[in-house]
Amino acid sequence: MVEQIMIQGTASDAGKSILVAGLCRLFKNKGKRVVPFKSQNMSLNSFITATGDEMGRAQVFQAEAAGVFPDVRMNPVLLKPTNDRQSQVVFMGSILDNMDAVTYHDFKQTLISKIQAVYQSLADENDIIVLEGAGSPAEINLNDRDIVNMGMAKMVDAPVVLVADIDKGGVFASIYGTIMLLNEEESARIKGVIINKFRGDVALLQPGIDMIEELTKVPVIGVIPYANLKLEEEDSVSLSGKNYVPNSSALLDIAIICLPRISNFTDFHVLEIQPDISLRYIRNLAEFGNPDLVIIPGSKNTLEDMAFLEKSGLKKAIQHYAEKAGKVIGICGGYQMLGKKMLDPNQVESEQIEISGLGLLDTETIFLNQKRTTQITGVTLSGEPVEGYEIHMGQTKRGESTSPFCEIKAVNGNQETHQDGAVSTNKNIIGTYIHGIFDNDIFLGNLFNELLTLKNKTVYPHEIIQLKEHKEQEYDKLAALLEENIQMDQLEKIMKGEKICVSTQKPVIKE
């Protein structure tokens, strides 16, 4: 029979996704068949599986940590906000519809039996499932129809461990408040607490641990120290802490436009881990500076984000930068914005029908009702092998003054040839639909060398850090960190349904 543990949090960005990934790697290293599971994920960071199904990025990196291929069953429901009122609802990798919150709140009850069936299919194939909740289980206005926190735990009778982030302050209030807001049945499911992102001497924390255990009757089974692990961050909350000031000692300054509806910012994780590269996210004109490369990322609402560029003054700044031979790369929605105009006659993304783009590429985009979700392999026109994935509802037509960026050779593992993207005559403006383009080390190394040449500097002096190898190392570090700082014997008892005693829990943080 499958063993299971559910990680819920006191708030968003408490560390649930990372903790699930670490536990998946830890159990994998013990020889267990383990998979992650999140019934419903709200995110603009998504991935396309080998079968062309769309799922949340968090469950992808958790699957990588578990040593298994991403499977859409690990994230059956994906909600992709299109604006402040609506989300695109994706079930088992395919779009169902756009729904507002009230409509979806009623609709999701129809998904319960389907989610249970999906979960059972994973349970039949694995030894352990590590479940992840969303936000906080104490969203009491939504709990009557919850399918992702205590509602999910109840569906499969999973024990829960609550994780709380001490780095933001108020950790004991958040633990106590969360547990006290739950009804008796729900709070009884919480079998342990983990305090995350701790800095300092745990001896100073111990009196608080003793008090919270006495108040809640729930043991604290771990205190995880703050660790500077370089892992993907899925939650958009994490973007608020991203740097916008260039590092003057770095060889290259790369600026990413932080769009209000930015999607798939995980595309840029590989840039963050490269030595001598300053990567920053800019939100307004004052932060623009004089970068060596500007990247316009993907967007879940391209027309509204284009309007943001206009209103903020960033449109003119990017155009002026390009006129002075600056290098600009647009990914997916960013590619669409580089063109002359975008048309949305069916109002797929926005209430706007048409909007002018940056005009840096001779292209036009029309939005269609059908979404393209594919994994691809190909070769750039410069001869670099690339692979990645596409997620878009726009169809872009190139004009005569542009060249294609890439020749696609295979789609979802099947031979298929077509052209992707567009490149300006002077080669300084590049647009592509390929997410994960920077994960290709040959392409990335050549890009760095090109940018350094434009600055009259020598070639990039470092070997490109390959993302896959880097991730494997970080997953192992994460697993070791958890094993050292969580009372694993107590966690395993919880997973087996055994009762653990509050009075015996004395977590000791390891340096």
From Swiss-Prot:
Pathway annotation: Cofactor biosynthesis; adenosylcobalamin biosynthesis
Gene3D superfamilies, alphabetized: 3.40.50.880, P-loop containing nucleotide triphosphate hydrolases
Active site: 332, 435
InterPro entries for the chain: Class_I_gatase-like, CobQ/CobB/MinD/ParA_Nub-bd_dom, CobQ_GATase1, CobQ_N, CobQ_synth, GATase_3, P-loop_NTPase
Function field: Catalyzes amidations at positions B, D, E, and G on adenosylcobyrinic A,C-diamide. NH(2) groups are provided by glutamine, and one molecule of ATP is hydrogenolyzed for each amidation.
Domain (GATase cobBQ-type) ranges: 251-443
Glycoprotein recorded as keyword: no
UniProt-recorded Gene Ontology molecular function terms: ABC-type vitamin B12 transporter activity; catalytic activity
Annotated source species: Listeria welshimeri serovar 6b (strain ATCC 35897 / DSM 20650 / CCUG 15529 / CIP 8149 / NCTC 11857 / SLCC 5334 / V8)
Alphabetical keyword list: Cobalamin biosynthesis, Glutamine amidotransferase
Chain segments annotated as coiled-coil in the UniProt record: none
The family this protein is said to belong to: Belongs to the CobB/CobQ family. CobQ subfamily.
Protein name: Cobyric acid synthase
A Pfam family annotated for this UniProt entry: CbiA
UniProt-listed GO biological process terms: cobalamin biosynthetic process
